[in-house]
Amino acid sequence: MNKKILFLGVGGIGVSALAIAAKRLGAHVAGYDSVANKLTAKLEALGIVIFISPNGVDVANFDIVVYSSAILSSHPLLSQARSLGIQCLQRAMFLAVLMKDFSYSLAITGTHGKTTTSSVLATLLCQLDKYSSFIVGGVVKYADSNIQVNGTDKLVIEADESDASFLFLSPQVVIITNIDLDHMATYNNSYQTLLENFTDFVSKESVKSIYLCVDDQGCRDLLAKYNQSDKNVTSYGFSINADVQIYDYHIIDEITHFKIRYKGDDLSFKLQLPGRYNVQNATACIITCLDLGFKYEDIRNALIKVTGVARRFDLYTKVISGHQVTVIDDYGHHPVEVANSISAVRDRYPNKKIIHVFQPHRYTRNRDLIKDWPKALSLADQLILLPTYSADEQIIKGAESQDIVKGLSGYLLADGFDHAIYFLEKLANENTVILIQGAGDVTNLVEILSE
């Protein structure tokens, strides 16, 4: 890739990964972001020039400009590049270009779990095939990075359905974890339009194998809608109707055990990640690797080394009011993700009381899922609800934090982190486990606990 490429919004997790991948594939790379952070520091350490002010950037020196969704079309650097006739590519469009440098690409998509599933498959393939690479939307703990380029054989990518940008991609393998109602403004608030976009994605000529979780209603709807016979379509899940059925799920000493029935064989596995949903995610990756020709024993040995992705059920021990307390930091921000996480906490800590500290993310999500929130937020033993993280949205009347728990009782409304800590200091002890959850800045609460 002998090109000069400028990445706008390079301080984000997705664009930073593309910048590193492009550099390792031979491109001359520079980046711009309005704020320096850990990711821009990492890029500078790799020899990538980072601009914090647009004033020092000579756009005319570049062949391609890649931009994140956070960069407005009116941004001066993007406007200048377009006026000069320089090729300008949205993040997913450039990922599609990068994919052409690899022999075989595997894309993971779905409303929930795609980052975790991508990290599982990336961890497996990097152990099973030293020439495998990955570009995902989170820090894979096994590699302590969101990107690794080990060659140009296999590439694992996360395909984003939230803005329909997965339609730019042309992989050979597609894993769909689930199809649910989120980011519905992208699909004109139409479930049928959402399904049609997923159908268009898996119908691409490049796609040869499709793996879907049949436990999910959205995936079942897609299977009913999809009728092409020229592709290898495999369903997986706990359902007896799955082509590859999961069974005998149980926890021993905080290790998840399960079996799958694959082409007549009963195969057993162990996994460090918690919950039925992560067993579903892992199964998709296992059968993908089996179909690629890797041996069961090698996959089994690699799977137990999978530690997932940052901010997905991260475990900490904190001292709170003199008590050692297990604290879990999790990115979940949708009712389905909340319910799955609380179920996983119950499975792993059956004798402990769950205190759920939740920070809603986006007023539009509160509004669109207003009927689903009360059930999900009632599942813990104690809910502490924080103000909604706006993500730059304007407040929507009737869609604030207190509105998503209408009909519930016993919850505690915290006006900020200090208030939440006050509640935790009153409630937490050795017999409790604290789940701190949300896609905003609530992870900072984990850091300041017991300081």
UniProtKB/Swiss-Prot annotation:
An example Gene Ontology biological process: regulation of cell shape
Source superkingdom: Bacteria
Entry-linked Gene3D superfamilies: Mur ligase, C-terminal domain, Mur-like, catalytic domain, NAD(P)-binding Rossmann-like Domain
Similarity comment text for this entry: Belongs to the MurCDEF family.
Primary role: Cell wall formation.
One example GO MF annotation: UDP-N-acetylmuramate-L-alanine ligase activity
Cellular-component GO terms for this entry: cytoplasm
Entry EC number(s): 6.3.2.8
Pathway participation: Cell wall biogenesis; peptidoglycan biosynthesis
Lineage: Bacteria, Pseudomonadati, Pseudomonadota, Gammaproteobacteria, Thiotrichales
Gene: murC
Binding residues for ATP: G110, T111, H112, G113, K114, T115, T116
Protein name: UDP-N-acetylmuramate--L-alanine ligase
Pfam families: Mur_ligase (PF01225), Mur_ligase_C (PF02875), Mur_ligase_M (PF08245)
